[in-house]
């Protein structure tokens, strides 16, 4: 199929989403003010939300990785290494919360340690996988809240032609998109929007 900047999967097993949501409730007490990529600081004019971090050693990491690979095979065909930082962001957006227009990655690279594919675990000195500069290539967001349980909070994208479009709000929808795509989370008007968010790194663009 032709390359699309976003890839959506809306038919993930609902029973798995329910199990996932129940299992990660233990991370609710770890929620803290969300920071902004780049300067690693709280910037309420840019982003207002709370999040905790779930290590990819958790079974959810491998489960999501399976679908990331599926999206990559079917659409992107990028060279990928692993989930950035070995963690997945578990995010809560309460009434009044938002994330303004931003991108998750560009052509700039950052040093990453050697990591074991699909786990986020650092490799031992006697193992080799990759080392050095990496770039964020794909971003993903898994909708955990029923659309009827909150108003606002839409994930909105804008393409190179200036056209805007929204991701599906259906619970259990996995959205995978090119990290260079401009997007935002619109202000939540009521209720609570929960999601799992992460980024996938690979070698520098060629």
What label would you give each PLM region?
Residues 1-174, 180-206:
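Fe(II)/2-oxoglutarate oxygenase catalytic core
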